[in-house]
Amino acid sequence: MLLLATMAFGQAKEDAGDGKMLDKQTMEFKDYLPEIHGTIRGKYEYQTETSESRFEVRNARFSVSGNVHPIVAYKAEIDLSDEGSIKMLDAYARVFPVKDLNFTIGQMRVPFTIDAHRSPHQQYFANRSFIAKQVGNVRDVGLTAGYTNKGGFPFILEGGLFNGSGLTNQKEWHKTLNYSIKAQLLPNKNWNLTLSTQMIKPENVRINMYDAGIYYQNDRFHIEAEYLYKMYGHEAFKDVHAVNSFINYDLPLKKVFNKISFLARYDMMTDHSDGKMDETTKALIINDYAR
């Protein structure tokens, strides 16, 4: 199947909306004012095999973030049109007890993988990769801790505990919490090596995921490769393998637009299940079987 897509979007800044620590002891009036960011992404797709086409508002995201104290930040984000559905995405408070250390509680994206952690305004392609869309795409409610080391050998370490019941079943009680750990190693300003692992238990089957990714970036090029391995407890489903690799070259423009990008990608995924069970057969359901 060949899918052609064009996309137009209005976007926020690269680091837009995340809760940040203020480098001051006392807040002024302007420091209490919230930041408002948004991403509106519309696209047109044409499917050559069936000669069918469609227009779609893929995202209409808006976020509000700010500080109530130099070391206490907040963020709330909603998508008014995620393929036609309204979804509450982020709703959290973040505390910075000391410099470079933070704790976050609330609803957020789980720290896992490279591509699944990108917001729509950071995506390189009109359609997300299989890792970002299916295999590694998790938002949940929980508590995370993050530490950034800027000296010596720089790195960012994140980890957290989560309900595991998604965004809509927050009142459920759990005997086992999900966890996720992510480490970013930054040998220099151009390289990023990311290693992460996650355990989830959506119903009765424990699922473990392991991800490794690396990218190189300079003023013109972004080259990235990522591999995700997913295994199911008691061999309830075949192990899943997913790969996302791409290259992006930016050509600067002087008028109207800032740049034009040339991209190529290899994206694959074996049969995948999110852990939901068929009520009749009691077997795990294959997601997006007709992909």
Provide a role label for each language-model segment.
Residues 178:
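Conserved adenosyl
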Residues 1-20:
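Cleavable N-terminal export/targeting peptides
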